[in-house]
Amino acid sequence: TIGSIIGTFVPTFVTIPAFGTSVTFLVFAGILLLLALIYFISAKKRCVSLVSGIVLFVLCCFGGFSDSFAFWETNLLYEGESVYNYLQVKEDKENVILSTNVLFGVQSVLKKDAGLSGMYYDYMLAAPVLAGAQEKEKTDVLVLGNGTGTFAAQCRKFFSRSQVEGVEIDEKITALAKDYFQMPDDVKVTTYDGRAYLNAIDKTYDVILVDAFQDITIPFQMSSVEFFRLVKSHLKEDGVMAVNLNMRGDGGGSINEYLSDTIGAV
């Protein structure tokens, strides 16, 4: 029980935020080896496996340790970790791409030709149109799950009178947005949980994009009827909510179906 508690909370709140995942593995491997060493010495037993483990641990610490996970990548601009994510920024001839916790996925993209992204962000641009952005002097847009600001930048480009705010829980991703993705300086980004942010403000918006769902990783607090009611309360009378589910599954009983039913109940 004690080991389970330590193994759950110490990596989450101490070692991973302070040192990263690789060092965390080595720290806990060292602790296990130390406990094994104490046992075999106190029991006056000899164990070839323990000695081999110690040798292997030392070799990993001084010879095989690397901060880079994607050692095969040749086009990385940045690789690192945050409290929430493993982060990669890659560049090719046409794009700068952010990937989190995956080898091949794309969470944010910057097109070097300043055109459309070719991804779901382009479809989301229908939301300001439906909200009447062309006829309004100012269109207030809120992005919950701002990432590196792909949608925010597109709103500023194609709807010049839009005023965009972003909420992003991972402050390292926001830093990458400024360093590599040319996020507009006039996009205000708050480091906070999306639902908690809505609870803390009174402002209403023409468009709210909920972009916090990543594959099967769904913030439970942002997938309930109560959450979508909260979003609705922050929309203007003719406001539009857009949601990126980013998950496959068209059959009955899929998570998409359940979330659609939840939204439809509001």
Residue ranges and their predicted role:
Residues S42-V55:
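Membrane-interfacial entry segments at the cytosolic side of transmembrane helices
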Residues L56-E165, D170-F181, S254, L259:
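Class I S-adenosylmethionine
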Residues D238-L245:
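Conserved beta-strand signature within the Rossmann-like core of class I S-adenosyl-L-methionine
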